[in-house]
Amino acid sequence: VAATYLVLCFLAPLLMPTDSVPELSGRANAIDYAFESSWGNKDHGEGGKVGHDQSQHGGSFAWAELNPLWALTYGFGDLNCHQKHERSWEINGNQMPVCTRDIGIFLGFSIGCLIFGLRGFNRWTVRDTFLSVFPDDSMRRVYEKDMRLPLMLFIMGLGLVPMGIDGFTQLLLDSYESNNPLR
């Protein structure tokens, strides 16, 4: 599912008419661009933490007016991402449905699912299933000392560290603004 959505995030702006998606700037966990009258299409001033003057950034956008597949793609992005144009890629003159950080999250999740699909086994517990991607010989000591849960939590935490550092540094320091290559 994540890989399919990731592909749709690239296909939607590529296959839509050029310049049909303007520069967006919404709020995470909110629907900002469903209709012409939605919050994101209003003018909220420049330089604020959320929103901008949409009329100065290409005009209004309503994903509900798109074909159903593109509407689903942009609608899911609208609900889950802030869609700030300066943090998003543009394809064919159209802003992508989610920011570069979310593209990285979907890519990492898709790669993890692929690795598990090729190497993992469905075992009795989540931690055993999670650790099944590693060769059994390298896991012998972990099982003998029953260190499965701490190892699983450590690996998961290690995977979240880059995202956490980037997100919290940006939140806590006004002088730091993450850029697309870092995301």
What is each model feature region?
Residues V1-D19:
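Hydrophobic secretory-pathway targeting helix
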Residues T4-C9, L79, G108-G112, K145-D174:
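Small-polar-interrupted transmembrane alpha-helices in polytopic inner-membrane proteins
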Residues M16-E23, R87-P97, G164-R183:
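Interfacial helix-loop-helix junctions of multi-pass membrane proteins
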Residues P17-M96:
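Extracytosolic (periplasmic/ER-lumenal) interhelical loops and adjacent juxtamembrane/interface segments
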Residues Q95-S110, R183:
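Membrane-interface loop-to-helix entry segments
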Residues I103-R123:
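Membrane-interfacial alpha-helical segments at the cytosolic side of multi-pass membrane proteins
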Residues R123-L149:
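Membrane-interfacial, low-structure loops and terminal tails that flank and connect transmembrane helices
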